[in-house]
Amino acid sequence: MRLSRYFLPTLKENPAEAQIASHRLMLRAGMVRQTAAGIYAWLPLGLAVLRKIEGIVRDEQKRAGAIELLMPTLQSADLWRQSGRYDAYGPEMLRIVDRHERDMLYGPTNEEMITDIFRGAVRSYRDLPRNLFHIQWKFRDEIRPRFGVMRGREFLMKDGYSFDLDVEGARRAYRKMFVSYLRSFARMGLKAIPMAADTGPIGGDMSHEFIILAETGESAVFCHRDLVDMAVPGDDIDYETDLNPVIAARTDLYAATDEKHDAAKFDAEVPKDKQLSARGIEVGHIFFFGTKYSQSMGALVTGPDGKEVPVQMGSYGIGVSRLVGAIIEASHDDAGIVWPDAVAPFTVGLINLKSGDAETDAACESIYEKLTAQGIDVLYDDTDERAGAKFSNMDLIGLPWQLVIGPRGLKSGTVELKRRATGEKEELSPEAALAKIAG
């Protein structure tokens, strides 16, 4: 993509309304623009990141055996009355009346709708287990939306739901999603720590939040330091094998947010040199809710004994749009964003130091075509801005590689390659630079 033809409305100054780094940098980098309180338009650069994150989430869900569908944003209030949540949910729910005076709502979550879809299609234990997910926009009318996409009113979520005949089956589904989440976040360049979360009236141990460490996190977190760099299962993971060892390696070590923190237990279980106290951001949550919805909404299956029983359900959420902000909170510096490779909107920022110079233009065009032919996403700054502005802009948007081409380097047969994450610069031949970028 040529910058001269791209839509990238960057800002030179920090927006006054931005309180945290991710909000400030997303606005400055031209990723989003606010259209109303807590509601954002996603501009091309931001949308590119959003799609990369979606792709990773989708890939890992399918790898773990989940099946994708797409549910609408608008839901009938009747479904929520069946579950008993319509009147109880509160003012966060946006309630709508259509032209036929029917009560509708803009879905803040999808338990009722997925249960309705399931109960209309599945009647026998032979059709179990099932794990269904979708990636869809949601709306919650937060009283004080703030921090940009981190706590907005409209947001993109991955919602998944498992359906099993019994609790043991539900545990297997839960373990698969636990591992799937570890892999998803690791692929995004994040070190996500699973922490025991509230299970509500159901009880048990099947509720975990996935937290990434960031100075501006909304929660205080306390954990064993070894959890931060613990290895994540590789591509050869078999989800049909026993996943307990992978999970136990994490859940056996202390990890809690301030809501669940037990200071005495922390000191007793974790050596002082291994204690980590920090701030964290929740990016995912998985939990088992048993028959809470299947019982009240009549999602029943006939078991092997011929008797009807309500299915056991689990819920698995990832904040897709929130992850964009969370990644920036975890990976930025004074100059701007530092994107992990897997979620970067472009892999390379190609900088022409002297647009209009025939030799420099030709060299840039040649490299641009070669990178593009290899399937590498390139943002080519072919504008006539001064060099300093081009460098600042590329640092701000945080692409993993910066490839700089100018008349002086071309005379000696070299280009400059900069790694954004480390700031390391190298003078290389064009061929060597291309090889390094290609990996």
UniProtKB/Swiss-Prot annotation:
Its EC number is 6.1.1.15. GO terms for cellular component: cytosol. This is Proline--tRNA ligase. It catalyses: tRNA(Pro) + L-proline + ATP = L-prolyl-tRNA(Pro) + AMP + diphosphate. Catalyzes the attachment of proline to tRNA(Pro) in a two-step reaction: proline is first activated by ATP to form Pro-AMP and then transferred to the acceptor end of tRNA(Pro). Homodimer. Disulfide bonds: none annotated. It comes from Parvibaculum lavamentivorans (strain DS-1 / DSM 13023 / NCIMB 13966). GO terms for biological process: prolyl-tRNA aminoacylation. GO terms for molecular function: ATP binding; proline-tRNA ligase activity. Belongs to the class-II aminoacyl-tRNA synthetase family. ProS type 2 subfamily. Keywords: Aminoacyl-tRNA synthetase, ATP-binding, Cytoplasm, Ligase, Nucleotide-binding, Protein biosynthesis. InterPro entries: aa-tRNA-synt_IIb, aa-tRNA-synth_II, aa-tRNA-synth_II/BPL/LPL, Anticodon-bd, Anticodon-bd_dom_sf, Pro-tRNA-ligase_IIa, Pro-tRNA-synth_IIa_bac-type, Pro-tRNA_synthetase. It is found in: Cytoplasm. The lineage of its organism: Bacteria, Pseudomonadati, Pseudomonadota, Alphaproteobacteria, Hyphomicrobiales. HAMAP family: Pro_tRNA_synth_type2.
